Amino acid sequence: PQTVKASSNMKIVLTSDNKSLDEVIVTGYGNFKKSSFTGAAASMSTAKLSDVPSLSVEDKLSGNIPGVSISSFSGQPGAMNYIRIRGMGSINAGNDPLIVIDGTPVNSGNLSGFNDAQTGSGYNGSGTNALSTLNSNDIESITVIKDAAAASLYGSRAANGVLVITTKSGSAGKTQVDFRSDWGFSNMAINYRPTLDGDSRRALIYQGLKNYAYDNIDGTTDASAAAFADANIDDYAAKPENGWANWRDALFKNGSNQNYQASVTGGNDKTKFYASLSYANQNGIVDRSGLERMTGNVNVSHRFGKFKLDASTMISSMHQNSAMDGGASFAGAISSAVWFLGPSNAIYDKNGNLLTKTDGAYNNSYNPIYENQHMSDRTN
């Protein structure tokens, strides 16, 4: 520092002093600078989470932490995902990492009682896990511990790594109120395995019947081949009384999602607080599939003398409606009906009533729309 006499005309030039903040690693027994942490770990702040338009914490993690792979086996809203840290460690046993939220280990497997805890398969074709109950806006940071240090911190449960989640806490200063909301729509990104409409399919089969006549009936002429096709076409491509069926449009729709989040934080040198409420509602692209979630979070910290008291409460209520997306309830995957059933397999009768069964090779000829309306699953 330099002291000069005051004058009416002074020019002050400040030189820059570049300083960088060390990345912090949160473990089971304290916080460390990354430069001083000897284990294999990676951390991510909420700055990368806030602008990702997804209700799933796993979707926001995907591709942001080295060594962590996240894959989904279902497009069901709220469905659990596979989380693998440095690949699979076992063929028969579980490979899910331990999840620790604010120092408390939680169940990292499937929370649905009707499903396998590791694969999610079973009566409910999708399942759900603890991360589905979290509001990503409440997360301050996520640390992934990848090596043997995880087992030394948390025991054998951490053999597949640890996902350490730290939620937001209050800070001294003016009380700040934050509100954000977003809306969105979803549909099938790819027209997977396009199918023929009724007229095109009938014309193709008609030509196939004529070709069959040419190859297998002696003395076939153009007229007799056409007569053979006319006599047999309705056995393979009959037009229903109320028109051709469009199973893709009948089974799938445009999905939607809405998300509302409100939080308040503040405090002084002694007492700091953070509180939040959120509501999320997501409708899937299959009828009767969706997720409704409400969360509440309160973190309070108070210092008196040499002592410090931290109190944290997190409440979450979630309702998940599951269609037969991956094969469930002794029925096949509802998405496969698009390819098993054709335009000739009627959805409704001539009076517009939904048929219980339809002529086709799907689920012993049961109408998948009827099944979905009467066999969907609900997880609370």
Report each predicted region and the residues it spans.
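Short, acidic, small-residue-rich periplasmic hinge/interaction motif at the N-terminus
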Residues: Q2-S50, E58, S71, R180
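Short, glycine-/polar-rich solvent-exposed loops and beta-turns at beta-strand/coil boundaries
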Residues: T3-S8, S71-A79, Y154-A159, K253, ...
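Flexible glycine-/small-residue-rich
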Residues: L14-S16, I25-G30, S72, I85-G89, ...
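Solvent-exposed, polar/charged alpha-helical surfaces in well-ordered, non-transmembrane soluble domains
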Residues: S35, G39-A42, A47, L55, ...
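Residues embedded in well-ordered regular secondary structure
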Residues: S43, N64, Q76-N81, I91-I99, ...
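Non-catalytic regulatory/gating segments with a bias toward low-complexity or hydrophobic composition
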Residues: L61, V68, G103, I142, ...
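Surface-exposed extracellular loop regions of Gram-negative outer-membrane beta-barrel proteins
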Residues: L134-A150, A159, N257-D325, T379-N380
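Outer-membrane beta-barrel translocator/channel fold
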Residues: M318-F340, A346-G352
